């Protein structure tokens, strides 16, 4: 895809995987093409529930549960135009990229083997397997710790050996807050930075005057 001379470089969105303990980067998945749309929703954590307790009407228990939904396209078309420079795409199509995305939603084979060995040895307690912490990166102002809640892959084109060469990937992500991770967890501190960035951006908008609503004051 050509660009106009002098046009600003388009940043890529994607997912960065970090070690939940040390915070060290363990991998990164850059979207080949940025999604055209990004849907977000918020579930308010109201303190009063539906009971009608008047003292709780404006209270919240914690951060709203924020969710993202996005669709990304993965294609080998550009790579297959230059087969000598892209032997992996020629041999496997986009299976490596899809496999990397699938690794976000399941434990590794090494973790499964390790837990099975613990079970065979008679271990009384086997902890659930911990995956790397995914961070949704959408520009410098939005870096959020997330959990993948939904992954759907529609393979749309194949090579003669049935390797997929184009697919649409639908991702559902839930932002992990300090309610999920705690303040001492690396993800908790990343969430606080994400929330504080939003607060700083909100302060850039001046408060509207009541006159714009046709009001001279409140009743």
Which residue ranges define each predicted feature?
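Acidic, Ser/Thr- and Gly-enriched intrinsically disordered low-complexity segments
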Residues: 1-219
């Amino acid at each position: 895809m050509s660009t106009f001379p002098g046009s600003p470089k388009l940043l890529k969105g994607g997912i960065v995987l970090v070690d939940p303990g040390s915070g060290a980067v363990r991998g990164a998945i850059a979207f080949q093409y940025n999604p055209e749309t990004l849907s977000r929703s918020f579930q308010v954590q109201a303190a009063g529930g539906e009971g009608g307790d008047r003292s709780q009407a404006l209270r919240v228990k914690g951060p709203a549960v924020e969710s993202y939904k996005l669709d990304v396209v993965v294609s080998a078309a550009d790579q297959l135009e230059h087969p000598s420079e892209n032997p992996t795409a020629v041999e496997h199509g986009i299976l490596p990229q899809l496999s990397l995305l699938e690794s976000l939603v399941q434990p590794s084979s090494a973790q499964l083997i390790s837990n099975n060995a613990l079970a065979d040895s008679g271990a009384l307690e086997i902890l659930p397997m911990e995956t790397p912490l995914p961070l949704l990166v959408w520009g410098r102002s939005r870096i959020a710790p997330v959990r993948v809640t939904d992954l759907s892959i529609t393979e749309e084109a194949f090579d003669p050996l049935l390797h997929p060469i184009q697919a649409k990937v639908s991702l559902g992500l839930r932002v992990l807050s300090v309610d999920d991770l705690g303040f001492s967890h690396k993800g908790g501190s990343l969430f606080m930075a994400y929330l504080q960035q939003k607060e700083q951006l909100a302060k850039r908008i001046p408060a509207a005057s009541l006159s714009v609503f046709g009001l001279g004051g409140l009743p």
